[in-house]
Amino acid sequence: MNDKINHLIKITGWFTVIFFLLLIIVSCTVWQIGWIDIISYTVTISTFITIGYERFMWKWKLFRIFNKQADISGDYEATLRYFYGESGIKKVSVEIKQTFLTVNIELRSDEITSNSITADIIEEHGKNILYYTYITNPKAEFEKKNPINRGTTRLIVGENELTGKYWTGAETTGDLRLKKLK
């Protein structure tokens, strides 16, 4: 996360310098702007551009040369293979929402919904890995069989799929494979 914050600070610095210089050039050539106005406009424009960059501009091809952050946002169909007493396979849907600094994951099945508590994509041995901790919220009819639980997932980020493993505090483990929907 610190690398991402440092990157965002550098991008903000560059935006600020560029807009400041552009406004000085405009002030000297086109229309007279006072120093206080130049500083005010620079801060305002840089703030909005930084917010836009953090929310969505970092995904644009133009800005991809400045960062290597994987864009995994979207809807996925997933196969969950679980091992706990009995084992089985379950089809689930996953929605990933992402900004430059945050990742939020929601997994839905016929029995539960789980939401990420913390999540981050890190580089591990040259690969992007999504780690996230989650809490489950079972439907009332499944609460005794599948109570509220906390767990962690480690997924290797591929082009259009994520694959990996999860484990929980109830000693449940399993494999998870997500395929991005178009």
Swiss-Prot record:
Disruption phenotype: Loss of protection against phage in S.aureus strain RN4200. Keywords: Antiviral defense, Cell membrane, Membrane, Nucleotide-binding, Transmembrane, Transmembrane helix. It is a multi-pass membrane protein. One of its GO terms (molecular function) is nucleotide binding. GO terms for biological process: defense response to virus. The chain crosses the membrane at residues 11-31, 33-53. It is found in: Cell membrane. InterPro entries: Cap15. GO terms for cellular component: plasma membrane. The C-terminus forms a minimal, eight-stranded beta barrel that probably oligomerizes. The beta barrel domain oligomerizes; in the presence of cyclic nucleotides (probably 3',2'-cGAMP) higher-level oligomers occur. Effector protein of a CBASS antivirus system. CBASS (cyclic oligonucleotide-based antiphage signaling system) provides immunity against bacteriophage. The CD-NTase protein (CdnE) synthesizes cyclic nucleotides in response to infection; these serve as specific second messenger signals. The signals activate a diverse range of effectors, leading to bacterial cell death and thus abortive phage infection. This system triggers membrane disruption without lysis. A type I-B CBASS system. Belongs to the CBASS Cap15 membrane effector family. This is CD-NTase-associated protein 15. The gene is cap15.
